[in-house]
Amino acid sequence: MARFSPSLRIGSSARLSDNVHIACIKGVSIGNHLLCGSGVLITDHAHGSYRGVSASDPAVPPAQRPLVSAGPVVIGNNVWLGDGVAVLAGAVIGDGCVIGAHAVVTGTIPPGTIAVGSPARAIRRWSPEERAWLPIPDANAAERLS
């Protein structure tokens, strides 16, 4: 039987809607003033491994596969997660980000970014000089955030 030493930290003034699921075997750190929509999943692990030579055998039922973490999840301060967002193992979301409804975050979202889609892609960044959310050039081919 595997042993885990999970570390879960939720900052002050977090606002969570209904059906928010936070699962942790390694580490989940959530900053202050999170606004979290309905049906959000934040997890630092998966049932099995799906890359490389140690990938899980599909003949083994998912519930019997070992829990595997690709790394802790870190969510900064003043972040808004829209309804249905999934934040997966190893994801880092910087301060002041907005993650659009049903986005899947698998990598790093820089501070002050609006990201949408699956996988999450940056579409706007906050400009302190202009005090506005500016489109990212070539947003139609928005960079994949990894």
Give short role names for the model-derived ranges.
Residues 76-81, 99, 133, 143-145:
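Hydrophobic transmembrane signal anchors and adjacent membrane-proximal interface regions, especially
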Residues 58-64, 113, 122, 131, ...:
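A generic alpha-helix propensity feature with a strong bias for hydrophobic helices
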